[in-house]
């Protein structure tokens, strides 16, 4: 079936071949023939958009809820604030390492792209498999459910919100944000900018209220700030995990490196601006919480920010639950934006079906990857105990993040002459690797069963890799090839999408990338 069926003017776009065909026709609108625009994702993310993406993804629901977990395991205000500071410092070091990686390997995909470059396709595929199967859809489903709970809860003050209503609202939220990101990249970044400003303003309001209370002489909670502190290594590690949950998202911009304007400058600069802002906001917000709430209040609270507002905001206390919901909405938008690019890059490298590396011919958005991400998240919304699934990937997450930085050290040795616009002292990646090793080891001892389940999920990708990637396409069952070809062609026509110019001109044979 020829591309003329799409009815598009020059440049002409061709559909993928059927399974029994062996070539992909060239794009008649290639740069050599003077096409007005190349079929690639556009560089539309400015420095301000980048800061909003990082800040918006980091400030999700965690800072409104996680103080309870940190204080539970530290048992004192002083030690709790130290843990928050350590979590921020650790995240800054990790973000700096990723800034070097992102300016050296200017591909989207974050740790997937870096592991692929350093260690090859097999380990990179396992990283992609874990993200596809558990990490991204589970985290997005949880954020969407949290958003729905905070929106519906005011209507049911004396009981839990209806299960079905929460899940339907969560699904509507996911679908709406998917549509926004399919429509235009600018729509997604504008939504992100708006909701980032809203959540930062909400936290500033909490900080100001806390400072007012301090100035009024409410310092009793800090007079013996370390009294009752728990110095048990296991408790401290669990407290750090709770803090790091709130700091997660510092690698968001590395998922979309190819869409950043002047990434050699703006990627490290956006990270350098975002990380101090978030760390300072988190520490000051906790100071505000601890000024007003005693330890028992924090322990009994399901959402510390809401309890704080009830005691300080008076008739305006309703604004904080709304702020939490808006924070979740913005965080979900950033997660959808980033994870769709991960699947896009994975497909472009031959680790996922070709259809996921297509973009809309007019809007230049990865519509199939966004729809795939949406579908996976909706599936997990059906799972009643979806919150339990988050326990399965703590081990895998820190393993692959740490492995990315090990790859940074390896590439320093293997490819010393590569241009590196940002080159850190080796002190930073070495410290981060050591700390990541600790974060990988702790769950193995403190939460062995869930960690082993997480390892099992990762290893389930091994046969998938050998059957779907390593095995030559000609040796795969004809039935599967025909199904994939049909689904790809139908998706291409329904979504009005084509392969990017990189796929068409440099990978004409659509070869699978292997080691």
Swiss-Prot record:
Cellular component, GO annotation: plasma membrane
Domain of life: Eukaryota
Disulfide bonds: none
Annotated tissue distribution: Strongest expression in brain but also detected in testis, parotis, small intestine, heart and kidney. Weakly expressed in spleen, lung and liver.
Keyword Amino-acid biosynthesis appears in the UniProt entry: no
Cytoplasmic topological domain: 1-44, 100-114, 189-194, 257-266, 333-363, 407-424, 473-515
Keyword Transcription listed: no
Membrane-spanning intervals of the chain: 45-65, 79-99, 115-135, 168-188, 195-215, 236-256, 267-287, 312-332, 364-384, 386-406, 425-445, 452-472
Gene Ontology process terms (BP): glycine betaine transport; L-arginine transmembrane transport; L-leucine transport; neutral amino acid transport; nitric oxide biosynthetic process; ornithine transport
Pfam families: AA_permease_2 (PF13520)
Primary localization: membrane
Keywords: Amino-acid transport, Antiport, Cell membrane, Disulfide bond, Membrane, Phosphoprotein, Transmembrane, Transmembrane helix, Transport
Topology, Extracellular side: 66-78, 136-167, 216-235, 288-311, 385, 446-451
UniProt subcellular location: Cell membrane
Phosphoserine PTM positions: 30
Its biological purpose: Heterodimer with SLC3A2, that functions as an antiporter which operates as an efflux route by exporting cationic amino acids such as L-arginine from inside the cells in exchange with neutral amino acids like L-leucine, L-glutamine and isoleucine, plus sodium ions and may participate in nitric oxide synthesis. Also exchanges L-arginine with L-lysine in a sodium-independent manner. The transport mechanism is electroneutral and operates with a stoichiometry of 1:1.
Quaternary structure annotation from Swiss-Prot or TrEMBL: Disulfide-linked heterodimer with the amino acid transport protein SLC3A2/4F2hc.
Similarity annotation: Belongs to the amino acid-polyamine-organocation (APC) superfamily. L-type amino acid transporter (LAT) (TC 2.A.3.8) family.
The protein's name in its UniProt record: Y+L amino acid transporter 2
UniProt source species: Mus musculus (Mouse)
Gene it is expressed from: Slc7a6
């Amino acid at each position: 079936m020829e591309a003329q069926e799409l009815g598009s003017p020059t440049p002409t776009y061709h559909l993928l071949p059927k399974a029994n065909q062996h070539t992909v026709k060239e794009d008649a609108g290639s740069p050599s023939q003077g096409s007005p625009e190349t079929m690639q994702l556009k560089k539309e993310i400015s420095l301000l958009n980048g800061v909003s993406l990082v800040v918006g993804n980091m400030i999700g629901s965690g800072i409104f809820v996680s103080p309870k977990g940190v204080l539970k395991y530290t048992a004192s205000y002083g030690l709790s604030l130290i843990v928050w500071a350590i979590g921020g410092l650790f995240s800054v070091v990790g973000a700096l390492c990723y800034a070097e990686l992102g300016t050296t390997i200017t591909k989207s995909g974050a740790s997937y792209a870096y592991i692929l470059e350093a260690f090859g396709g097999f380990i990179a595929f396992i990283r992609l498999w874990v993200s596809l199967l558990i990490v991204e859809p589970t985290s997005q489903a949880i954020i969407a459910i949290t958003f729905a709970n905070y929106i519906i809860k005011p209507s049911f003050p004396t009981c839990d919100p209806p299960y079905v209503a929460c899940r339907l609202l969560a699904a509507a939220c996911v679908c709406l944000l998917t549509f926004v990101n399919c429509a235009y990249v600018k729509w997604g970044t504008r939504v992100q900018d708006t909701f980032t400003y809203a959540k930062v303003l909400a936290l500033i309001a909490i900080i100001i209220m806390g400072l007012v209370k301090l100035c009024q002489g409410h310092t009793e909670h800090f007079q013996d700030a370390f009294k009752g502190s728990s110095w048990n290594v296991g408790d401290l590690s669990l407290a750090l995990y709770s803090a790091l949950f709130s700091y997660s998202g510092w690698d968001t911009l590395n998922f979309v490196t190819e869409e950043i304007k002047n990434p050699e400058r703006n990627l490290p600069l956006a990270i350098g601006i975002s990380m101090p802002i978030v760390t300072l906001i988190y520490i000051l917000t906790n100071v505000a919480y601890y000024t007003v709430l005693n330890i028992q209040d924090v322990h009994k609270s399901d959402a510390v920010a809401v309890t704080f507002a009830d005691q300080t905001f008076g008739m305006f206390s309703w604004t904080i639950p709304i702020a939490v919901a808006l924070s979740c909405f913005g965080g979900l938008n950033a997660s959808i934006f980033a994870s769709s690019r991960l699947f896009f890059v994975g497909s472009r490298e031959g680790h996922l079906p070709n259809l996921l590396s297509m973009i809309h011919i007019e809007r230049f958005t990865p519509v199939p990857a966004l729809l795939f991400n949406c579908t996976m998240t909706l599936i997990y919304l059906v799972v009643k105990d979806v919150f339990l699934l988050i326990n399965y990937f703590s081990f895998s997450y820190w393993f692959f993040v740490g492995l990315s930085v090990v790859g940074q050290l390896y590439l320093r040795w293997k490819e010393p002459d590569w241009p590196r616009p940002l080159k850190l002292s080796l002190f930073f990646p070495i410290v981060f690797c050591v700390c990541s090793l600790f974060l990988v080891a702790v769950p193995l001892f403190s939460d062995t069963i869930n960690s082993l389940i997480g390892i099992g999920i990762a290893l389930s990708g091994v046969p998938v890799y050998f059957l779907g990637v390593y095995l030559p396409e000609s040796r795969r069952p004809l039935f599967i090839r025909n199904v994939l070809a049909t689904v790809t062609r139908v998706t291409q026509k329904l979504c009005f999408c084509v392969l990017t110019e990189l796929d068409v001109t440099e990978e004409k044979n659509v070869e699978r990338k292997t080691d």
